[in-house]
Amino acid sequence: MGQTLSEPVTKKESASCANENYLVGSSCMQGWRVDMEDAHTHLLSLPDDPKCAFFAVYDGHGGSKVSQYSGINLHKKVVAQKEFSEGNMKEAIEKGFLELDQQMRVDEETKDDVSGTTAVVVLIKEGDVYCGNAGDSRAVSSVVGEARPLSFDHKPSHETEARRIIAAGGWVEFNRVNGNLALSRALGDFAFKNCDTKPAEEQIVTAFPDVITDKLTPDHEFIVLACDGIWDVMTNQEVVDFVREKLAEKRDPQSICEELLTRCLAPDCQMGGLGCDNMTVVLVGLLHGQSPDTLFTKCARPAVFTGVNNEDGDQNQIQQDISRVINNFDGEQRVNAANQEEEEDDNEPAPANFQV
């Protein structure tokens, strides 16, 4: 855990925006940390593609320069890829992450900076959702009150991540990269990206994101993007339940985000650091071209928990993508398993109800 203050900074920076498709709120708070290192973005329409919305959370560490730079530039890099104009959003996101990382390595503003950042981005276009993630920030959607993950956390204790780390000359100790970094993918962190014989995707720490896709249905109610300052305190489902209850009361997303930060803030930092991190959350209410009252009414319905896989074995695209990722993890054997007691279930690559 980073250095903490004697009293938390509870002033929140909040914002809101809306159009016919989205009702959006955001809030961030420094909390107990000495500095605020997070950044976030919410764009209802991209300048180069008005039909495309872009939302992101960046959780910086070791400083704020890389997170702030990413918040300003990552969406521009994604849109600039030829794959974006061709409709290949997955590859556009992957290349956008890597190109931004390379740009920061040579930019005078960032090339000597020691900081890094997670990045979880959600791009929505014409009913299709693309979530790119590097690190341990997270995006979760609510589908009739059921939490559906759009990303999973990249931890050095995951076997596939550990294999890459070791192959590039690093090691995993106390569930940290080289005993230092608690996540295995990030933008920046250039001290971990110096293996000359490996491409960017195979460095000790890589900026290469996993991209999961989904298709919006009328049952999709909202998407929450947040840093681990939220997810370390509350599970995916607890966050969805919290937000849904407030929306059912016709609360605006900005105030819901602010209340969520307050809910997650620790009363002190004497009990392991949970609730003592910087906190950032972006709440994207999905209107589907209808009025906000329709969303509020949907959120007042009883939740329906279906599980991820249908009993007949049919899977939608997000289920297929997460299944592919889980298969890539070869059963998710753990490194340093004896040190895992502190990890929450939501830090696994996918929740237990993802059957493969």
UniProtKB/Swiss-Prot annotation:
SMART domains: PP2Cc. Disulfide bonds: none annotated. GO terms for molecular function: metal ion binding; protein serine/threonine phosphatase activity; ubiquitin protein ligase binding. Mn(2+) 1 binds at residues 59-60. The lineage of its organism: Eukaryota, Metazoa, Ecdysozoa, Nematoda, Chromadorea. It catalyses: O-phospho-L-seryl-[protein] + H2O = L-seryl-[protein] + phosphate; O-phospho-L-threonyl-[protein] + H2O = L-threonyl-[protein] + phosphate. Coiled coil: none annotated. This is Probable protein phosphatase 2C T23F11.1. Binds 2 magnesium or manganese ions per subunit.
